[in-house]
Each structure stands twice: as C-alpha cells, then as structure tokens.
Amino acid sequence: MDLTTPEVAEHPDVLRNMSRYTLGLLPSEPPVGDMNNEDSDTNTSITQSPTNSEKLTDILQESQDTKALQEKYLQNIYALTQNQLFKNVEDYSFYNLNREKFQRDKQTIVGVMRKRRHVLNKKIKRLQSHWKQVLGRWEENIARVDRLTEIDKTKNAKKSEPFIKRSTRKVMSNFTAGDIVRSEEEFLEILAKLEQQEKEASNVSEASRIATIPPMILSEEEVKSQYFNDQSRLVTDCPKFYHFQSMPDIWNEEQHSIFVQQFILHGKKFGKIAEAVPGKNSKECVLHYYLTKRTTDYRALVASATKTKGRRRKKLLPSQRGGKKKSKGSALMVDIEAADINKTEENINNQFQEASVTADNMNTWDNTPSVENVESANENVNNHNADEQMDEKIKSLVEGNSAYEIEKGAQEPDPMSIDMTDKSETVSGFKHDVDVYDTAENEGNNTLLQIKESVHEKTPTQDEPMDISQDTIKQEDYYEPKLEQHSSSKRNSISTRKEEDAASALANLSAVGRSISAVDESAHQGHLPGWDEKEEALIFSLAQGMNPMKMPLTPRRASTGPRPRPTFQLTEIDSPNRRRASDCITPSISKILKMVSEDAKSQRIDELSVEDQEHTTHSSHTTSDINAFPNSQSFPRASIHTLAALGEDIVERQSKNDKIV
C-alpha cells in the first residue's frame, strides 16, 4: 500500500502515529543508496528542519523491506476502527485474556485485600474502646450533677411549708390487689421498665425528627472510592471564557431619549429600561450608560426632575390637592347661591321693580337702600348731627375719585367709574341693591330674608353716560331685566356679592366709628340719635379701636310690649363677661374685610401705575383716599342690620351643621 493513495492522505493522524512507531523499530543508520552529496546539501538547504514524517517517507522510498511493515501497520489500525458489537461481554476477545490474567494474580490480590481489612478492624476496635471510656466519664459526670440537683431540691423543700399528710386508708382503698408491691426488687423492676418505655418513646420521636448519620469513613481507599467529581462546568481557559467581545455602541437619537427618560424614572434598573427601549437588551443598556456617563450627566437630570416635581406640586391649588377643606363662610355662600338659583322668574322681576324704588332712597353716608319713603330717610339723615363732618369728608373723597374716573371713562369705558354730585351715589360695575327694612324695631332675621330675596345685579349699558345723579335714576337706564343675563351672571357672582356686601359694611362701620369724637358724651346720654341698640354697640366698639372690647348682645323683647332701651356705658363695654360685637359678624367676615381691602388697594395702585402722564397728579390723592376709606369705590355699602343678621345666620347654620355631624 503506497502513501500516495487517497486512503492514507485522508488520515494524517495515521502518518504521525506510524512515524512514531516505525522510528523506534527501524535502524538509526540510513541504508546506502544512490543519493549524491549535492542532492542532500540542496535538500537540507531548502528544509533545514525536516519533520519526522518527511524523514519516514524518504526512508520508506529507499527501503523496499519496510513496505511490508507499513502495510501491516495500516491494516491493524483500520481493523481497530471497525468496531464489532456483541450482546455478551464473554464474546469479546479481551475478556478471556483478562480472566486468565486475573486467575494468575488472584492470590496476590486476595492477600492485599485481607491485610487491609485486618488493619481496618484493628482501627475500629481501638476507636470503640476509646469511645466507651469517654462515654463512661461523661455518664459519671451527669450522675454527679443529678445528685447535686437532688440535694438542692431537698434543701429547698425543707425550707418550704410542711406537707399535710392524708389518711392512708383512703389511698390504700384505691389500690387493687394486683397493684401491691410485695418486695423492693419488684418495685425497682417496675421503675426500670417504665424508664425503658419512656426512653424508647423519646428515641422514636427524636428519630423521626433527626437526620440519619452516615457511617464514618475510616480508610483512605474508601475516601478515594467515594471521591466526588466537582469539576462540573470547570473553566480551563479563563481568558477565553471571561472575554467579552463588545459590540459597537450604535444608538439613534430616539433610543437615547427613551433611555434617558426611563433612567430618570427607574434609575439603574437596566432590566426595566431595556423593556422600554426598542431593539436593546439589558447588557447593551449597561454598556451605553457607562460609555455616555461622561458626556451626559445623568445625576443632574434625575435631580432636576425631582425638583420640578416638587415645584409643580406646590403650585397646585388647594382644590386640586384635595387636602384643604372649604371654610364655613364659603359653605354659607354656596348655600345662599343654591337658594338664589332656585328662584322663579316672577320673583326676579319683582326684585327688579323693588330695586328701582329703593335706588332713590339710598342713605348718603352708608349707601344702603331703604323701603321707607324719602321723607323718613331724610329725617334719619338730619338726625345725624354728630356725623355731619364725617359725611362731608366722605363726600369730598368720593368726589375727587369720581372726577378722575370720569376722565378715564372718556378714553375707554370702565364699569367702575364714579360720579358724585350733591350727595350722589357710588355706581359700581356690579352694583348690589339690598332691600332692607331699616326701622327702629327691625330684627336681624327678617333683614337676612330680605337680603336673600332682593340681591340682584345692575349692569350699566355702554351706550349711556356714566354721570348719573340721584334724580335721574330709572330702571330702564340702569338695569337690563333679561332673565338669561341675570341667571348666567348670578351663578358666577352670587358668593362674591355676599362677601363684598359684608366687607363694605365693616369698612363703613370702621370709618363711622373712628369719626366719633366724643364717645363718652354719647355713652352717658344713653344712646346715639337715629341708631338702634345693636348699631350703638357696634359703633361704640369700633370707636374703641375695631372691636377690642366685649359688647352686650341685643336684648330680647317681651311679647307683651317693647322693653326700655338699655344704656351702653363705657363700664359695660370694658366688661370681660360680655360678648364681642364682632361675634355677631363672625371672624370669617372680618377676614374678608382685610382681604377685600388689600385686593382693592393693590388693584387701584396697579391701575394708577399704568395711567398716562396727564393723570399723575391724581395718584397721590387717590392713594390717600384708599387708605382712609378702603372700600369706598370697590363695593357699595350695606346697612349695619345686614351685617348683624348675616352674622347671626352664620352662627345658626354652624350649630345646625355641628348637630348633623
């Protein structure tokens, strides 16, 4: 068989094995041939380090005797590759050979195994004897400890109270003949049996809970035979195993923006981030983070996101947050609004008609309408001799502001412009006409009912002039009795109108109270001319500095007839046992006064700041007017009965709500 055959060329391993095998068999000296020295020199120069296979091929080509060995060797190798399968092990040729070899070496193997067993038995006996010695010492120690504990128990038993012995007859009657112990040996035997039963029961219960202990391995051969192969998944080539072939970090802008958004939400939870980023897994997200962390400041992005969340939360309204509840004052306004919306069209028309009549009967100093005729209103005004100076002062202030508003209205229509000529009235963009029965015997509850029924809106038209005197007030000029306009505007402004009414009343009371110069004389005289008892209480308290003192309540009148009016002395006002006059007003309305006065002042100042240069002369005068009389232009003034009745109604509603809750 030649080496150039395709069968040999397909098996290069055969040539290598054959070279190793034949080099050991063939002689080291090469046979004499027809090779020239020149050829050998040229061969060595071309291949300076020939391999064994090349040497072997040269030798086989020159020697004809080695061809037979080559053919035989190759035949043996190919014969081994053809595996023959047998059902029984005895059918294989190597089985009989191994059996003969075992029979020949059997005695030697048995002697070695017998010697190992003998050594192992001696070791076991030595360990058992040692264990018995240790066990005996341990049992002696346990017995000694038990005796000491029994001695301690007997000492403690003697110190305790003596045990009361019972009669032996009853005890013996419970025993039967079979329970009687005849001797001490039987007694000890019974005790031993009981102890044995207890031990067996305890051993059975413990054996069910304790794991089985395997036998000890005493010989080295057993250790080797029970060797556990822990080379499962063994890493032989560490650099190749732990090498991470990084793929190019190719991310488009959309993927990067999604990655940044998810990183702000989830942080370094790259598993969740990879779910949102299309076409990327968690490993790629981790790699992208560490490659871009120098160029993109992820920590700053997370910090800015948390800051913006906090700011947005602070800017939310209380109604949006849902944390702050409405005050009781606003709840009252909602109730009044619901009652007003349910009014019928007929009642609304009646209110407009009543408003046209009462608009001519407004009082000049408190700007509140009256149901009485013009003569009775003039008489009440003439009775205020002590307040004429304050009336003139208010008139001058309003006249100055009205002149400025008229000039402003000529340039652009302004619904808040004012004109005052000869005790004229303040005309607001949203004027509230309140129908109140201001009589000497008037009570707060009746007044509140009239407030709820007669509150409406007066809207001046744009085509009409803004300078309107008291003599030219007409319903068709000032009011547009359209039901659609009235109902739509009423829903939006009903609550603010009630607050404005109460706030303007407080403002006027404060101005009138501070204008009284001789409080002592009025108090000693018994009452103020033209004022009822509740009005006097409010005026006295306001004159002392905006309700710093306790004031008495309005006395009840008997059913038989009116009781004489009490005199309000300064000693009674200073009494701490009296209620404040502001309790009838409720603190919520006093807060409304402060809020409305500040808003009106700031709004007025803002309007003045953007005016033209020609109106700058009026700015200082208007600002001083606002400080002196805060709500003279913002809202119309209501009567004191309106204020007191509203306060009493608030107290009643609060008590009813508390009972319901």
Curated annotation (Swiss-Prot):
Domain named SANT: residues: 246-297
Cellular compartment(s): Nucleus
Residue numbers spanned by region Disordered: 25-52, 306-329, 478-499, 548-570, 604-633
Keywords: Nucleus
Biased composition (Basic residues): 308-328
Biological process (GO), any one: negative regulation of gene expression, epigenetic
Residue ranges with Polar residues bias: 42-52
Bilayer-spanning residue ranges: none
Record field: compositional bias (Basic and acidic residues): 478-487, 604-617
Cellular component GO terms held in the UniProt record: nucleus; Rpd3L-Expanded complex; Set3 complex
Keyword Nucleus: yes
Nucleus found in the keyword field: yes
A molecular function GO annotation: DNA binding
Protein name per Swiss-Prot or TrEMBL: Uncharacterized protein C22E12.19
Organism name: Schizosaccharomyces pombe (strain 972 / ATCC 24843)
